[in-house]
Amino acid sequence: MKDESETDERNHLEGVEEGEIVDAEPDTLSLTPEQHERLKSLIHGSDLFDEITNAENRYLIFGRNEGELGERRKKLQQLLDSRRSATAFRLEDFGLTSDDIHLWAPAFDVLSETATHVVGVLEDYDGGHVWEMGLLYYRQSNVRDTLWILKRTYEDDDLQRERYDNGMAASHIAALEESIADRVVTWRTEDDLEEAVKKVP
């Protein structure tokens, strides 16, 4: 007869302890068993995951996904993906949709541990990527060692404040940026962004 604990261990999602994501503690990532199984299927059932694990440099790209901001993020992904022995990927590449909202945080948790570099394209403090940065701030000091932020700055001071004045998020992200000061690269134009990404090893 199989040991139940051994069976459970084989069913765990690599990189995430089941107790950590099922317990309904305020600071944990809560998933139902069904959600946990879907997350495992989306990530480990993807051909992309095999490609990622075989690459020497693995870039997880996060940031806004709408309109021009999303296009710039895709461009960054293409630039990093074109490097030798490298692959660049986003959560969306694993088939996560708006219906999987509860899976985005734990998926980011797992994939950021898998990545050799976590690269954020930051143009404002609005959107799901702010939550992802908060997760890095609170829970993953080891992942912070791999974090790079490509942060857009604006010539107009009022616009700068409008884009980055977001109360608690601003203070938390400012602390995160300070902790990785030499890996925060600023840019203003798309040409600047192409130059900025060259600083990411």
Predicted regions, residues:
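Conserved catalytic or regulatory cores that recognize and/or transform ribose-phosphate-containing ligands
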Residues: 1-201
